[in-house]
């Protein structure tokens, strides 16, 4: 019984980290912390990288919202 409980606890700790690591795509978001940031679509279109197509990442834009953007290497 204790072994089963310990195993379930171990999966509860490890599994969420594994899932979130799979959702993040390589590359980095463009820098919007500039004196005049590039403006983007002023609405949120994503909440995580997996919401975006192919190589795009979910990044902040110049309006303060999250949108799918081409990732920088």
From Swiss-Prot:
Record has Manganese as a keyword: no
UniProt entry keywords in alphabetical sequence: Antibiotic, Antimicrobial, Disulfide bond, Secreted, Signal
One Gene Ontology term, aspect cellular component: extracellular space
Listed GO MF terms: peptidase inhibitor activity; receptor antagonist activity; transforming growth factor beta binding
InterPro entries on file: Elafin-like_sf (IPR036645), WAP_dom (IPR008197)
Signal peptide positions (record): 1-21
Occurrences of domain WAP (ranges): 22-72
Chief localisation class: secreted
GO biological process, alphabetically ordered: defense response to bacterium; transforming growth factor beta receptor signaling pathway; venom-mediated disruption of cell wall in another organism
Pfam families per UniProt: WAP
Disulfide bonds listed in the record: 29-59, 42-63, 46-58, 52-68
Subcellular location: Secreted
UniProt note on tissues of expression: Expressed by the venom gland.
Protein family membership: Belongs to the venom waprin family.
Entry function: Damages membranes of susceptible bacteria. Has no hemolytic activity. Not toxic to mice. Does not inhibit the proteinases elastase and cathepsin G.
Name of this chain's protein: Waprin-Phi2
């Amino acid at each position: 019984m204790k072994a089963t409980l310990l195993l379930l606890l171990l999966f509860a700790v490890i599994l969420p980290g594994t899932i979130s690591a799979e959702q993040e795509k390589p590359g980095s978001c463009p820098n919007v912390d500039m004196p005049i940031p590039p403006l983007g679509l002023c609405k949120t279109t994503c909440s995580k990288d997996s919401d975006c197509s192919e190589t795009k990442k979910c990044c902040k834009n110049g309006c303060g919202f999250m949108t799918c953007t081409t990732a920088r290497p």
